């Protein structure tokens, strides 16, 4: 069975990922399009299903979906799996799924449905007008006088666009089927499919986070930046020492240090020759430009209700075939140079927001 769905959620999937996307209270599946055994594509308008005593297409879809013997195909199957699992409150075992996107990436094709269609010169191409339809129906809209102050567009607000949205979902299934047929001469080995299944279980399980550590790290970062800004203003007398233009002028005119820019490598190089206030200011500049806390912000954005963050890895995400990081980029964590004992104490101090004690321990 080939599947494509259209959904709505007030959570921004580009910021929070598919798993938290489905946790929004207003998350729902709007349209399901599917084909069984290469047959005609059926489209289910989910806004009407609850109002009908029996919906033949929907019942047929559920029978196939819940049958472990039926292989389910989708382009970026993780999204369909995650959304359908939430909708039915039932697990969607990855062992039953095939990801056409991953299988395309395995043979050097792009990771987007429309790009793959273009490269393969398929007769059926993804409808490029779909992005506008997604913006209209799948994400909140800005309240205006013209739209009556509403924050969401429903089918009744534009029936013509809604029918176009249904047709767009059908077209996506057509393209996905055409891609699967086109790449069938490059079969996926059993072991590679098993690796993808493992990957899905890893992403589904996620990683447990410490909410108090994230909060403490963000508070510490804010406090540290405020203190550094205070020091910078005192040293330079500038209204905004964060401004590259102001700081470069101060370094040149008042300190005699003609530095071309404030990029990290440049600052590190000029620190070797700087003295006095100029040296202190460059040291502060390096501290102020640190971005490690952004990972904590991303963790917060992606954290699910059970305080786990999911969907952190993309199978075959790189052209070489290796995994690629998504969201938090766990494979790229900052390296530390303190002992395990100091690290454990530091974590506890950050959780408790005892920053003066942390400063004594690590001189931060």
Regions found by a protein language model. Give the residues of each.
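Conserved "right-hand" nucleotidyltransferase catalytic core of DNA-directed polymerases
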Residues: 1-7, 11-13, 24, 31-33, ...
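Short, conserved, GDST-rich strand-edge loop motifs in beta-rich repeat architectures
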Residues: 17-19
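Active-site-proximal helix-loop-helix substrate-binding element of RNase H-like nuclease domains
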Residues: 27-29, 34, 38-59, 64-184, ...
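Cytochrome P450 core scaffold surrounding the K-helix E-X-X-R motif
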Residues: 10-14, 43-46
